[in-house]
């Protein structure tokens, strides 16, 4: 997964730079989300990866999916990906693109994993603390993961803050076995 993100990052940066320059970040965002969903569909992906399909035929398939929403720039981008056998990276490119878009809008997307559901008050306290820490607006999504036993794991981009009981037990286990 990390390797795919590494490969996808330059494509996402180039797409975002172009879209920003053209004032079309939302249009590109929509197109990349649709294309990402298409590539993740097993039947479509199997058809797309048939050896007899040329890169231009692959791009034509995407043109049919996007319909009138496909600009010439998106078509050129897809051609570049198809020519380099990188269409499989579309989900990662879309993810990286959205990350760049959030950074540009000074918004940090945060995923909070908690052993138990958080109350609205707890969510608000965490949101306020994270906005202060990152000095920007924060959007929070909460996932309940009972395996954590207690505590939370906070993920913001590449940063992870793990204050879960599971993590603390693992650290104790490592120390005892060392």
Curated annotation (Swiss-Prot):
Signal peptide: none
Bilayer disposition of the protein: Peripheral membrane protein
Keyword line: ATP synthesis, Cell inner membrane, Cell membrane, CF(1), Hydrogen ion transport, Ion transport, Membrane, Transport
Highest taxon above the source species: Bacteria
HAMAP family named among the record's database cross-references: ATP_synth_delta_bact (MF_01416)
Assembly mode: F-type ATPases have 2 components, F(1) - the catalytic core - and F(0) - the membrane proton channel. F(1) has five subunits: alpha(3), beta(3), gamma(1), delta(1), epsilon(1). F(0) has three main subunits: a(1), b(2) and c(10-14). The alpha and beta chains form an alternating ring which encloses part of the gamma chain. F(1) is attached to F(0) by a central stalk formed by the gamma and epsilon chains, while a peripheral stalk is formed by the delta and b chains.
Similarity comment text for this entry: Belongs to the ATPase delta chain family.
Protein name stated in the entry: ATP synthase subunit delta
Lineage: Bacteria, Pseudomonadati, Pseudomonadota, Gammaproteobacteria, Moraxellales
